[in-house]
């Protein structure tokens, strides 16, 4: 295939697509240039159906540091495991693509996005999403696309598509919306307490922009697209299906309608085990035994799926007996743990999350060094989902993509209400431990996080709560569900998570299993979510009405002082020698920013005060008219040098030592003496003159005796060679050394 180039303008930037030049052995490949961001996307499909009961789709987003003209960090100087941002971007692309493959498609598909050049003002993730859809669409892989995605901002009351870096920093909204030309099928958002109306407007305008990109893709597919391959889809034997439904459907229906989760799971498993045993015995010697038993398992899954959906759409009954807009029982607890800086335990039905707060000096912030310029991340929200939370065994180790994604969602939801660095100069870490799960654990972690922050004395603007909405749709009719549980999530069509305060939304996330949802469904889901959010906030506020006024006793205390920027090097010292010495002596932690803000942390207030005194002394400057208790450190004929504080010395001229005339400095002071002095002058070079006599009472003028004669005083003959007329010193002499 010869190279072909397609070009358009989108959101004020050039969008160029190249095909037929690189990665030609892949089923489909494109180079997407958006602004100066360049992404290569290659899509590949396996030749045969994979084993397993799921569609093995893998989407990767690879950040090459050369794309931004940077070296990778670390000893190896080579890209390693994907960054958190790369993992989240891969999930962002996967989610709108996955619903676009046929039911029963089991061939393995890999979509690899490689960032070759990076322009921070032209979204590489959106170029990668565009490229992923297009590479699949022009390939022979049976992909029912195209899809596209855009980023949406909200600045000065205006909706902005694919905002620049500067606009993004000013925006009250960070939204990614993706979909087909007919409907939205993926949403990811953080927002600064925006209303449902503004969020809906942003979603709909984002979808209008998505349609533009899809039209451009369709033009390219028409020009270079391949014919789709014929692949085998997983299907079950129709006669076997009819036989099992006739014999066991009523038993499975009864089991599904058991309200309590564990009892329901046990009841359905009894039916499944019974059916499996019957057919294992019946077909034990059959040459296609494995295929038949796979079909039996799939048929039972389909029967359970159908019954759950029938109950909700026809009978308006949910598996646990709730109404469609009813929340499960709620419980909130603070101070679940001693010693930690804050903790909250939130329970919703059989979903339970424990959130633990840790506060630390700003030196503990996470340094993010990716394609964007390096920056420090002050707030971290980590989410852990152990297998015991669902009563199962399983893998333990590093967090997977799902845990990283759920942690990031909670982080976005809570970050919007955190105090500024000036108000609260701490690094903040929340860890959510999911202790039980029956759906919506990510939203439980947000509620638990709010409890932990408030209990820990972090002055958040307002409590945040989260709720997960679901959808059951048969094409003509639909039902929106509030607070979905695991079964409704598994067999439903939508998982729409909404978090926020009483004033507005702080985070959204939507994934669907159908090809899209309408504005009508979005509107209804947002309205139901708002009502539910307020109910949850009532419970949180009843548990802890307001943020505690003080931090936990175990949390590090902080004091901040401001120093001149040119004094920073004095506090740090050569090679960090001075600051390390202060830390060693006092046991505190110290952070200094480039603006001269010095933050001192410790759980011991006395240690903070001591460190503060030392630093204040290091950067202290003498001032005219200030009085100091000084130590004599050097004596010269013309006066004495005294140490005012730390490394700051002053000269007390001999004429400023006493009101009476003195010939020898040693007659008044010795090295090591401590004397009170007053600063009387600081010259342009910073040299300091001080006075002892300025702090002494001035003696009265000499008076005549009764005979009218003057009182005796030392007399020096005028003919003496070195005689000089006495003069009053009104200012001190300069250092004559």
From Swiss-Prot:
Pfam families: KH_1 (PF00013), PNPase (PF03726), RNase_PH (PF01138), RNase_PH_C (PF03725), S1 (PF00575). It comes from Streptococcus pneumoniae serotype 4 (strain ATCC BAA-334 / TIGR4). Residues 700-737 have a biased composition (Basic and acidic residues). SUPFAM superfamilies: Eukaryotic type KH-domain (KH-domain type I), Nucleic acid-binding proteins, Polynucleotide phosphorylase/guanosine pentaphosphate synthase (PNPase/GPSI), domain 3, Ribonuclease PH domain 2-like, Ribosomal protein S5 domain 2-like. One of its GO terms (cellular component) is cytosol. The gene is pnp. GO terms for biological process: mRNA catabolic process; RNA processing. Residues 691-737 are annotated as: Disordered. Mg(2+) binds at residues 489, 495. It comes from the Bacteria. This is Polyribonucleotide nucleotidyltransferase. It is an enzyme of class 2 (transferase).
């Amino acid at each position: 295939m010869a190279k072909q180039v397609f070009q358009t303008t989108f959101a004020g930037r050039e969008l160029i697509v190249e095909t037929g030049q690189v990665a030609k052995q892949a089923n489909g490949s494109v180079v997407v240039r958006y602004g100066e961001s360049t992404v290569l996307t290659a899509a590949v499909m396996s030749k045969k159906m994979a084993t397993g009961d799921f569609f093995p789709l893998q989407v990767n987003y690879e950040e090459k540091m050369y794309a931004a003209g940077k070296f990778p960090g670390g000893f190896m100087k080579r890209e390693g495991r994907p960054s958190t941002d790369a993992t989240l971007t891969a999930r962002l692309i996967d989610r709108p693509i996955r619903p676009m493959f046929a039911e029963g498609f089991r061939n393995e598909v890999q979509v690899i996005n490689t960032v070759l050049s990076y322009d921070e003002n032209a979204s590489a993730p959106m170029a990668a999403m565009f490229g992923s859809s297009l590479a699949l669409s022009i390939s022979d892989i049976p992909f029912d696309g195209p899809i596209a995605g855009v980023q949406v901002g909200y600045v000065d009351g205006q909706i902005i598509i694919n905002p620049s870096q500067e606009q993004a920093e000013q925006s009250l909204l960070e939204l990614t919306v993706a979909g087909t030309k007919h409907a939205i099928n993926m949403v990811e958002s953080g927002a600064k307490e925006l209303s449902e109306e503004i969020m809906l407007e942003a979603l709909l305008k984002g979808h209008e922009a998505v349609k533009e990109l899809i039209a451009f893709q369709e033009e390219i597919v028409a020009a270079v697209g391949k014919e789709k391959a014929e692949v085998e889809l997983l299907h079950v034997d129709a006669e076997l299906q009819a036989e099992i439904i006739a014999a066991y459907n009523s038993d499975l229906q009864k089991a599904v309608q058991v309200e309590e989760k564990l009892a329901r799971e046990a009841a359905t498993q009894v039916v499944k085990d019974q059916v499996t045993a019957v057919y294992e015995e019946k077909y034990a010697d059959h040459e296609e035994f494995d295929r038949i038993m796979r079909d039996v398992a799939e048929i039972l899954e389909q029967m359970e799926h159908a019954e759950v959906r029938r109950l909700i759409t026809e009978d308006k009954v949910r598996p646990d007996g709730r109404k469609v807009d009813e929340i499960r029982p709620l419980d909130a607890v603070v101070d679940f743990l001693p010693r930690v800086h804050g903790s909250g335990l939130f329970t919703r039905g059989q979903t339970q999350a424990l959130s633990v707060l840790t506060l630390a000096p700003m030196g503990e912030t996470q340094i993010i060094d990716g394609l964007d310029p390096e920056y420090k991340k002050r707030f971290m929200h980590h989410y852990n989902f152990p297998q015991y939370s669902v009563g199962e065994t399983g893998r333990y180790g590093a967090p997977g993509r799902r845990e990283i994604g759920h942690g990031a969602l909670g982080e976005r939801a809570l970050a919007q209400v955190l105090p500024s660095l000036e108000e609260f100069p701490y690094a903040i870490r929340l860890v959510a431990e999911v202790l039980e799960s029956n759906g919506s654990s990510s939203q439980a972690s947000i509620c638990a996080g709010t409890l932990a922050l408030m209990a820990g004395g972090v002055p958040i603007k307002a409590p945040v709560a989260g709720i997960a909405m679901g959808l059951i749709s048969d094409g003509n009719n639909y039902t929106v569900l509030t607070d979905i549980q695991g079964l409704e999530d598994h067999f439903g069509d939508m998982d729409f998570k909404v978090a926020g305060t009483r004033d507005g939304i702080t985070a959204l996330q939507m994934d669907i299993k159908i090809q899209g949802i309408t504005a009508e469904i979005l509107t209804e889901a947002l309205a139901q979510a708002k009502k539910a959010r307020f109910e949850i906030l009532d419970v949180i506020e009843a548990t802890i009405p307001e943020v505690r006024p003080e931090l936990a006793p175990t949390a590090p205390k902080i004091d901040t002082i401001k120093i001149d920027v040119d004094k920073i090097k004095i506090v740090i010292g050569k090679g960090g020698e001075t600051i390390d010495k202060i830390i060693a002596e006092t046991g505190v932690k110290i952070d200094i920013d480039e603006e001269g803000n010095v933050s001192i942390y410790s759980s011991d207030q006395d240690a903070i005060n001591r460190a503060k005194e030392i630093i204040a002394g290091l950067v202290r400057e003498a001032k005219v008219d200030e009085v100091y208790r000084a130590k004599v450190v050097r004596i010269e004929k013309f006066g004495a040098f005294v140490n005012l504080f730390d490394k700051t010395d002053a000269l007390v001229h001999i004429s400023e030592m006493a009101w009476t005339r003195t010939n020898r400095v040693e007659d008044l002071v010795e090295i090591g003496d401590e004397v009170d002095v007053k600063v009387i002058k600081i010259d342009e070079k910073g040299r300091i003159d001080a006075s002892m006599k300025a702090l002494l009472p001035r003696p009265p003028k000499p008076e005549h005796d009764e005979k009218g004669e003057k009182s005796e005083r030392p007399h020096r003959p005028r003919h003496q060679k070195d005689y000089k007329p006495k003069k009053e010193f009104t200012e001190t002499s300069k250092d004559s050394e």
